[in-house]
Design a protein with these regions (language model features):
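Anion-binding alpha/beta catalytic cores of soluble intermediary-metabolism enzymes, centered on
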Residues: 1-210
Length: 210
């Protein structure tokens, strides 16, 4: 299997014969993700990795995750995604203000996927009290500070404009960023940006311009 392009390319990165590996255009993501975990490995302190898209719009810069890797994340996976997003946003010299999204607001639905998101938020707030993160919440409350502050004045995000959106699963993340892309083709999207692997392995799709 070493002659398969993903294994060969990633082994070159792992052994120092290449600085980075770009993949995904002609291979299945599921296979590429498996090889990346096996050959490159995940950064210490994490059990999962993910990807982020950056949206540069007239309204500002937004960071969206996870847009490619984790199909049905559980609470532990969402925690890792949130931690990786925080780290990545800071790398780009922004202060993360994180909303963890759902169709439910702050425990209103006590079943299904909102419970996973709520659990991730509770953990993050307990372990990282200095971090501006809250949820679970609907995207309209995440994006509208005045509406959010009026309806939910108790949030840790009071008075803050959200710039980082963590989606509850891959379906919502993929649909969300591609909907924004389709509605305004002039808006600049950067990504997917890999978060959490030990070395630079980057994924592309058919819409990639570079």
């Amino acid at each position: 299997k070493m002659f398969e392009r993903n294994y060969f390319g990633m082994m070159m990165v792992e052994t120092g014969d290449a600085d980075a590996f770009i993949t995904g255009l002609y291979t299945r993501y599921s296979n590429t993700i498996k090889v990346a975990k096996e050959v490159i490995g995940i950064q210490p302190g994490f059990n999962h990795f993910g990807t982020m898209h950056i949206l540069n719009s007239k309204k500002g810069t937004y960071f969206l995750a996870d847009t490619l890797i984790n199909r049905h994340p559980d609470t532990e996976t969402l925690i890792d995604i949130a931690k990786l997003a925080d780290k990545t946003v800071r790398f780009f010299n922004h202060t993360p203000v994180i909303s963890m999204l759902s169709y439910s607001n702050f425990g209103a639905d006590t079943s299904g996927s909102p419970v996973k998101v709520h659990g991730a938020v509770s953990y993050m707030q307990k372990e990282y009290p200095e971090l501006a993160i809250d949820g679970e919440m609907q995207v309209n409350f995440a994006m509208n500070r005045e509406l959010r502050d009026a309806k939910y004045p108790f949030t840790r995000l009071k008075g803050k404009d959200v710039n980082t959106l963590i989606f509850p699963n891959l379906s919502s993340a993929n649909a969300g960023y591609k909907l924004l892309q389709a509605m305004d083709p002039d808006t600049e999207f950067i990504g997917p940006i890999q978060m959490g692997l030990n070395k630079p392995i980057h994924f592309t799709d058919f819409e990639s311009s570079v």
